Every structure is written in structure tokens, then in C-alpha cells.
């Protein structure tokens, strides 16, 4: 394992003891299994121990001041529950569907580029973990191995995420492969017209392999007319990723999308943006049930998942937490992340007094001042402030 650096704005004694505990318990020299992890906090620390600084900063960092990234947690930490009691919660069902496909819990695996930098299997590990757990994974167009290899790695439905890197002929050739490989839907990412200034990576003098020498001018030129053309070429259920306002959500529905993916790219693109959970209510109002809604951004707990569901999302997607699971122990580490999330979801549903997700609504939530001060790791009590490691 690598040697993590403890920053001055952390309680170094607590964090060092946690790192030491995880290193001793999950040393590469010991016979350990991912099932030995009992919290996702342990998994995150193990991930940090396994990753180089460059890859850690790529996975965990945000754009410029990282304000948008921190607001994702601030928004979630500002919502608290209003539970109901004396309900029979002896049987809790956390399952749902997305675009007609079954999900064991309302959590999908967000697209991540350069997965091969995090785990040797790259996208294969994600596909296998998703199938074993019972969820959908979004396959990034800038990860390895090929979209065909990932498609046949497991039987679960997969959604192909598209970064436009060429003209419509280029798009048509790529989407022909996507359809032949049997992908269930297409997800077009539209919040990367320019590549965000990710200063942790810049100071490392490092960019992931998938970001080098790519034709960003094509993404900078995307319009609603381009979306229509890509949608016609695809002939698949169509998801628009990167929607952040009611205005664009309404336009997306008018252009016939099947689902809207509320996202600020994990705070890695536009600095000083809103938390995705704060965007959600206005987008739900604008969509009015005409498309399904998925959200990512700061989701690391089962309670986070249920906050999004209560505000009208059909499901959420996890990015950073997915990557941390992979870094901790590959496919098995990611599967353990999902198992822990499911346990948290079921426990929280029972304590809220609900047995089905469709019983949740905004009456189960209210706003408060977050405590402790929100940051990207504030869902984990022994990581008290600022950047992790």
C-alpha cells in the first residue's frame, strides 16, 4: 500500500489511527476478503492506501476551488428526516426500476473514464459487480477495455455514455457498435463543453489517459439540434446527462428524452455551481413525470439515496464511491460498497416508517444547518474537515 499524506486541516491523530487500522487489517500480505469491510469508510481509506497521488486526485478532486464538489455534500447534509412511527416495517422492499430494468436498490453505477487507472480490469470489474448485485452500470466511452468486451462481461443491462469526439459520421459509426453490442440505452453527456480546471491534477502535472489529445471542439459545438440528430441515429432510449436547471430539463423533455440525469459532473466541471440535490426539486417540477430522473453528486450513504428519492428522483448513481470500492479491492470491493449501501437503505427505510420507495416524498425531509461543516468527506465522522489524505 502507498503512504498517504495527512493534511494539516485534519485531526491527524484520529486519521492516522484509522489508516493504521485499515493497513494492518487489510494488508496485501494477509488473507483478506472484501467482505471483511464493514463500513464504506474503511473502503475509502483502503482505496487511498492503494492509489497513487495522481489517481487519487483524479478520482476524488474537483474543479478549481472545489466549491461545487463541496456543495454536493453541503446540500445533502442540510437535509434531515422527519420519520413516522408505529408502522409495520418488518418487511422492507428497496427495489425499483429504471427505464423498465430492475434495480435491487435505487443505485446505479455512474460512468467513469480511465477505470483502468483504478483497477486492472477496468470496466469489466464494474460490469461484473453490477450484474452480481443487480443494478445497471453506465459504460464510459473513454474507459477500457472496449465497449464490446464490457458488454459481454456480464448479462445485466448496460447504458453507454457518450462523449462526442467527432462529427455525426463518427457518432454514427460508434453507435452502430453500441447497438450491435446490445446496450440498453444511450446517455449523452452535455456538461463538458470545456474541460474543467481540475487543479489537483494540474498541480500533479497529470491527466488521465482518456483525456489526452481528444477533439473537445466537437463537444464545445453541441446544440439541441445536435442532440436531435444523435437521438435519431441512436434509436435507443435516450438519457441526457448534465442537466442542472428547470429550463434545460423542460427543453430536454420537449426533445423527447427518456430520462434526465441531474449532474454537475461531481463538481469537476463548473466551479461555484449548485448541489445536485438542490437542483432536483425544480427539475422534478419542470419534468412533471414525462421522463425518469436520475441524480449523482456526493452520494455516499443510504440516507443520501433516500433523500434523492424523497425529492422525486427515480434512482441515483455513484461515481467516486464506485471508484473507491474498485481501488480497495476491484470487483469484490465494489460489490461490498453496494452491499453496505443496501444495508443502509433498508435500515433507513425501516427507521423512517416506510416499506416501499414510492411511500417517500418531501414530507419526510426538512432543511437545517449542516453539522459538522460540510465537505466532500463529511458523511464519515472520523474525517473531520477539508481534504482527505
Residue ranges and their predicted role:
Residues 2-21:
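Short, low-complexity, charge-dense intrinsically disordered segments
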Residues 61, 115, 119, 139-140, ...:
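Glycine- and other small-residue-rich loops at beta-strand/loop junctions that grip anionic moieties
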Residues 104-142:
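Glycine-rich active-site/cofactor-binding loop and its immediate structural neighborhood
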Residues 132-153, 157-170:
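A gly/proline- and charged-residue-enriched helix-loop-helix capping module
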Residues 169-295, 303-307, 311-314, 320:
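Alpha/beta enzyme core
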Residues 339-358:
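N-terminal pre-core extensions flanking Radical SAM catalytic domains
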